[in-house]
A protein has these predicted regions:
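Short capping segments at the starts of secondary-structure elements
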Residues: 470-481, 489
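Hydrophobic residues on short alpha-helical segments
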Residues: 465-473, 495
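Hydrophobic C-terminal alpha-helix "anchor/cap" residues
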Residues: 331, 372, 471-472, 498-501
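Short amphipathic alpha-helical interaction segments
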Residues: 488-500
Length: 525
């Protein structure tokens, strides 16, 4: 991915609309069907209950004693994420894949121009306990900033890495950050700590949904470029106040700081995880806050994670889209014609994956299953269907499982595979588990049989023949086709004609139930 870098001054005047990709503007664009607004003052302790299981994003106009503005569950519905990209929900994955091929353009602007640095707090004033951070789950280790996007520079490449992270507040100027799972940030932190160097990090809180999608992508490139590519527009960035990390200039809040060079760790958690259960207490690095910058009218953001209604959470929706992109790429080399991919959000966005393919050669359904299992550790159950099944429909998937699946023939189980340690069904401490593939396709070459056809109301598209006999001499036809061929809107007159034809020609039916005139039958019997 080649990144075009330009100096901001070369694009003046008024080169950037810092409102176009602003979180506040996106929230304001949502209609009543997608946004619930709470104008009345509300204690921070009550926020989580309002958002739990909510199908809408929720905007609180007066949260906590500071009466702060806060929005949550912005990405908790696929329709809202699709709206951020300007497409319909079923078009989302393909649109993201298309934009990832864009050549990114990044423009650095001055600190004076950057809206995210309109207010700058450093030293003792950089107090994270003054932010509207709430307790999300009853047994959490403390209030969490759950919607932060981390920006860190990889010292080996000079690239900026972008990811999604959670911050557990420890004090006015310290947070815990979960770095147990393998990630680019973990690798950068461990390398710096081994060399006795601190790791500067900046966290953006309050970002457009597109930037969150960039945060879940993991690619060996400068990931500021992914933000720019997905925005489908030049990205304005600014250097932070207490480090040289560049972040989007249109962010709502930025929290700057570092992990110390000694690799000091403290207990972090427990926390309600994205699979719907609690994660245990872990020893994680301490993040030391050096600055908080924000817009004049900054909008704070929180993300929904965990609980029984996983499918309505930010984390599940974001994870699902990342899973779909990864699986789609893996399928390109595994099968000739992948049609669609959907990762169910009720499984956390990654454990249950549905794939539709058009089989061109025998065995492609199993190839698809193998590709999915190998593409991601947390892809646990793979369901492959023919393209006539709508993979976004639970009803149709249930029907395919009931009518096209034989367990002794179509179930593939693979054991000893790398998996996600957070899976609560695994033995404690295990990183190896089993995966299952469900081939819900018709056996190759059998999908065109009559018994594989789905009954549907007849369709009549216009007369093509002058008589039923002429239509039959054209080739075997179903009764519906005979009606269409002669322009019948009733069908009973066709029955009468067929009755008369039986006395004239050798009229018969084939194994599929189609009417036909036997070859060399030209006259009366």
């Amino acid at each position: 991915m080649n990144v075009i870098e330009k100096a901001g001054a070369s694009l003046r005047p008024n080169a950037f609309d810092f409102e176009r990709f602003r979180l506040r503007r996106f929230v304001e664009s949502l209609g009543a069907a997608e946004l619930e607004t709470r104008d009345a003052p509300m204690d921070l302790a009550g926020l989580a209950e309002v958002m739990e299981g909510n199908t809408k994003a929720v905007l609180f106009r007066a949260a906590g004693p500071e009466r702060a503005e806060l929005v949550g569950n912005v990405m908790g519905g696929r329709a809202r994420i699709a709206a951020a990209f300007g497409v319909k929900p079923h078009e989302l994955m393909n649109e993201v894949a298309r934009r990832l091929r864009n050549k990114p353009e990044i423009v650095e602007v001055s600190r004076a121009e950057a809206p995210c640095q309109a207010v700058v707090l450093t030293g003792a004033d950089a107090d994270v306990t003054k932010l509207p951070v709430h307790l999300q789950h009853g047994a959490d280790g403390g209030p969490y900033i759950s919607s932060s996007i981390d920006y860190v520079i990889d010292p080996k490449t000079g690239f900026t890495n972008v990811g999604l992270r959670r911050l557990m507040l420890r004090s006015e100027h310290e947070t815990g950050v979960d770095l147990v799972a393998p990630s680019d940030l973990q690798a950068i932190y461990l390398a710096n700590a081994a060399a006795g160097k601190p790791t500067p990090v900046s966290f953006v809180v309050g970002a457009h949904p597109i930037d969150h999608i960039a945060g879940v992508m993991r690619m060996p490139v400068d990931e500021l470029g992914i933000v720019a590519s997905l925005r489908d527009a030049p990205l304005a960035v600014v250097k932070c106040v207490t480090n040289d990390i560049r972040v989007p200039a249109d962010a709502e809040y930025v929290i700057e700081g570092y992990f110390d060079e000694k690799g000091h760790r403290e207990p972090e958690g427990p926390y309600g995880e994205f699979l719907g259960y609690y994660g245990a207490v872990k020893r994680n690095p301490v993040f030391h806050v050096t600055a908080i910058t924000r817009r004049e009218d900054a909008l704070f953001q929180t993300s929904t994670i965990g609980g029984k209604t996983l499918g309505r959470t930010d984390t599940a929706q974001l994870t699902a889209l990342r899973t779909e992109i990864s699986i789609w790429h893996a399928l390109q080399s595994a099968v000739r014609e992948p049609v669609a991919v959907y990762s169910t959000t009720s499984s956390g966005g990654s454990f249950n994956v549905r794939v539709a393919i058009r089989q061109r050669v025998p065995g492609e359904a199993r190839n698809a299953i193998g590709a999915c299992m190998g593409a991601l550790a947390n892809c646990k159950n793979v369901f492959v269907v023919d393209p006539d099944i709508d993979i976004f429909s639970d009803e149709q998937m249930d029907w395919a499982m009931a009518t096209r699946f034989q367990p002794d023939r179509d179930l593939i189980v693979m054991s000893g595979m790398r998996t996600l340690p957070l899976d609560p069904s695994l033995p404690p401490g295990s990183r190896i588990g089993a995966k299952a593939g469900y081939d819900l396709t018709w056996p190759f070459g059998q999908g065109d049989r009559l018994v594989a056809r789905v009954p549907a109301p007849p369709k009549f598209i216009g007369k093509r023949f002058d008589s039923v006999e002429a239509a039959l001499r054209d080739g075997p036809k179903y009764f519906e086709e005979l009606m269409t061929a002669v322009g019948s809107r009733d069908g009973r007159e066709v029955l009468r004609i067929l009755g008369g034809l039986r006395d004239k020609v050798a009229l018969d039916r084939d194994g599929e139930g189609r009417y036909f005139i036997q070859q060399n039958s030209t006259g009366s019997k």
